[in-house]
UniProtKB/Swiss-Prot annotation:
Location(s), subcellular: Cell membrane
GO molecular function annotation: transmembrane transporter activity
Key word Calcium present: no
InterPro entries: PHBA_efflux_AaeB/fusaric-R
A Pfam family the protein falls into: FUSC
Topology in membrane: Multi-pass membrane protein
Native source species: Salmonella typhimurium (strain LT2 / SGSC1412 / ATCC 700720)
UniProt similarity note: Belongs to the aromatic acid exporter ArAE (TC 2.A.85) family.
Entry's transmembrane regions: 23-41, 46-65, 72-90, 94-113, 120-142, 157-179, 362-381, 385-404, 411-433, 438-455, 462-481, 496-515
Designated name of the protein: Uncharacterized transporter YdhK
UniProt entry keywords in alphabetical sequence: Cell membrane, Membrane, Transmembrane, Transmembrane helix, Transport
GO cellular component: plasma membrane
Keyword Cell membrane: yes
Length: 679
């Protein structure tokens, strides 16, 4: 039977692009080299080297370097912890179990407090300790502790070195190119986002678009970290890239602020929409300049000095144009490789983030309880394969405690383990028993891994499954030195691994992570607490830090299915962020008129009275809004131009707070979920 040409073209090998072939060959060769080197170094379980090479198979240089550093640090820390715990408690099974469960629970708690490399290092330290320590319960000689620990660390390092070497031989696309492309795409998308938000209607598409823009900007921080590790140029420009991220977040805030003003402006100019479209079209041009932009927005300049609404919109629109043009210029200089000294940009710290400490503690407790239950069962039943169940349970609890959908991830892992159990049985007892040399086995592995890598790239919906099959295949085939073919041990070990994941799934079902509604309430409470701090004389965060912290809170529920929780978290974030910008502008606003300064202080005190960590209280929101409106109308008739500017700023505060009038009535939400208790 002959294969037709269309059928051949549909195979993964013929469908693959050159980039996909490069990725598949690089990772496959790295895994085969890692297995070969570990085997000839006489490491007793060389398949861990192959697994390590698979784990660090990132598509970019910076990703490989950053993940490798985190993996080495985590492996060394985990091996040290395993040696200390096992060395002192191995003769006392219960003390050993509680100590290991406590350490892995601590690592689960700690990884929730960090991001990127640090979080990955704590994850590795947790389940590396499990991989090393739990199999030690079956050893007789205490001197074997060091041999096992150094063998596991050596296998990890061999896999990392092979992955790094293949990345140098078959490099992928530049991290810097990917970062700059993402910056430019986001810069252009902000104009599209402005055109969408500056429309009078309110739809779910607008909310989703706003969440999407926030999430994409925060995701670029990961690209910045990868670029930092890939090239010295981006290490020198790291502070500038941080500043660009903050500027894009500020542009998002200004777009939202202008939207609030347009929605609360009773009589905007008739030509405002036409002028805005012309402005956005001009800003989209690569050579846009300040003079042309000024000519376009000139028709929107307020003619009536007492029209504080028009003045507020005009000032904020000018600020948006200035900030966008400045960002365009700075992005062009960074892309063209200009020296750092020539790029005039304010250096800012990295993006701020918040840790849900209650959820982190709960995850640590869940890990401790899961391992304790499995360990108690193993000790009581004298289950020889108990270490395998403990190891897989530790990996599951540590890895999936910080994912958004742990049940989906654990179900996928269960599916992976069942498929690998069947496949490894055929490979081990049908093929490997007939192989006498390693090179013969590599001839089988090489095309297999290449095909799986290509399928992972060509089937995005099943990429997670193919990735787990590649990573866990080594531990199921278990290429040991020397090889061992014992069907009873094979069956018991695979059963133990599946049981360990199943009990982890059960633990997540019993000790469930907080619901999205609960998480939303905690994030909103933290937002209000940080905003109250912003009203103090010496706030803990400056304007940019509070802005990035707020957007980090909002992004935490971007994948939530609870639309109400997600909507109110976004609404509170936008309201408090717009209010904080007004507060910082009021602080910077100065006038020689003492009465005007007192008016400014009154507005800040109104915010202190109306906002607390528990919500809007002490003064009804409607009364506060009426007071702000009265102040604006009074200042509009003042003879000093500074009073008109102050009225414009206060009206922006009124527009921001008015969004909280849409809070649901008490009793329509779950207990404790009321956003504005006295609205």
């Amino acid at each position: 039977m002959k294969l037709s040409l269309p059928a051949l073209r549909n195979t993964p090998w013929f469908k693959a692009t050159s980039g996909q072939w490069r990725y598949a060959l690089r990772n496959t060769i790295a895994m085969c080299l890692a297995l070969t080197f570990a085997y000839y170094l006489n490491l007793d379980e060389p398949y861990w080297a192959m697994t390590s090479a698979a784990v660090v198979s990132f598509p970019t240089v910076g990703g490989v370097i950053s993940k490798s550093l985190g993996r080495i640090a985590g492996s060394l820390l985990g091996a040290t912890a395993a040696l200390i715990i096992a060395g002192h408690t191995l003769n006392e099974p219960w003390l050993f179990l509680f100590s290991m469960a406590a350490w892995i629970g601590f690592c689960t708690w700690a990884c929730a407090h960090f991001t990127n490399n640090a979080a990955y290092a704590f994850q590795l330290s947790g389940y590396t300790a499990a991989i090393i320590a739990f199999p030690m319960v079956n050893i007789v000689e205490i001197t074997q502790l060091w041999d096992i620990a150094q063998a596991r660390v050596c296998e990890v390092i061999v896999g990392i070195l092979c992955g790094g070497m293949m990345m140098m031989i078959l490099p992928s696309t530049s991290d810097g190119t990917a970062l700059l492309t993402a910056f430019k795409n986001m810069h252009a998308r902000l104009l599209e986002h402005a055109s969408l938000l500056w429309q009078p209607e309110t739809t779910d598409a607008i909310r989703s678009a706003h969440e999407g823009v926030i999430g994409q900007i925060l995701t670029m921080n990961l690209l910045r970290i990868q670029a930092f590790w890939s090239h010295y140029r981006f290490r020198r420009q790291n502070a500038l890239l941080n500043a660009l991220l903050h500027q894009q977040l500020r542009l998002t805030s200004v777009i939202s602020s202008l939207r609030r003003m347009l929605l609360n402006w009773p009589t905007p100019p008739e030509n405002s929409r036409e002028v805005i479209e012309q402005l956005l079209a001009e800003l989209a041009k690569p050579r846009a300049d300040s003079y042309t932009v000024a000519q376009i927005i000139a028709p929107l300049r307020p003619q009536d000095e007492q029209d504080y609404r028009h003045l507020a919109f005009w000032q904020r629109l000018r600020y948006f144009c200035q900030l966008y043009l400045r960002s365009s210029r700075q992005l062009y200089l960074i892309e063209s490789g200009a020296p750092v000294d020539q790029i005039h940009i304010r250096r800012t710290p990295g993006l701020a983030r918040h840790t849900d400490n209650a959820e982190a503690i709960w995850s640590g407790v869940r890990t401790f309880c899961t391992l304790t239950v499995i360990g108690a069962w193993s000790i009581g039943a004298q289950w020889e394969s108990g270490p395998g169940a403990l190891t897989l349970a530790a990996i599951s609890c540590v890895l999936y405690s910080i994912v958004a959908t742990p049940f989906k991830s654990l179900s996928l892992l269960m599916r992976t383990l069942v498929l690998l159990s069947l496949f490894s049985f055929v490979v081990k007892f049908g093929l490997m028993v007939q192989i006498t040399d390693l090179w013969q086995f590599l001839l089988f592995l090489f095309p297999l891994f290449v095909t799986m890598q290509l399928l992972k790239l060509q089937m995005p919906k099943l990429a997670g499954l193919w990735g787990q099959l590649i990573v866990f295949m080594g531990s199921f085939i278990a290429v040991t030195n020397p090889p061992v073919y014992d069907f009873a041990d094979f069956l018991n070990d695979n059963t133990a691994k599946i049981v360990g994941v199943a009990i982890s799934w059960l633990a997540f079902a019993i000790l469930r992570p907080g619901s999205d509604a609960v998480k939303s309430r905690r994030h909103i409470r933290a937002l209000r607490r940080d905003f109250v701090d912003q009203l103090s004389r010496h706030p803990s965060h400056n304007e940019s830090e509070f802005e990035s912290l707020t957007y980090h809170h909002v992004s935490q529920l971007s994948n939530s299915q609870d639309a109400l929780a997600r909507r109110w978290l976004l609404r509170w974030g936008v309201v408090l962020l717009n209010c904080s910008h007004v507060v910082w502008q009021l602080r910077a606003w100065e006038s020689r008129s003492d009465p005007l300064s007192r008016v400014r202080d009154i507005c800040i005190s109104l915010l202190r009275d109306v906002m607390s960590e528990r919500g809007v209280q002490q003064r009804p929101l409607a009364v506060t809004l009426q007071e702000l409106q009265r102040i604006c109308d009074t200042l509009a008739h003042h003879h000093q131009p500074a009073a008109h500017e102050l009225a414009a700023i206060i009206w922006r505060l009124h527009c921001s707070l008015s969004q909280l009038e849409q809070a649901p009535a008490q009793g329509t939400l779950a207990p404790g979920y009321l956003m504005t208790p006295q609205a």
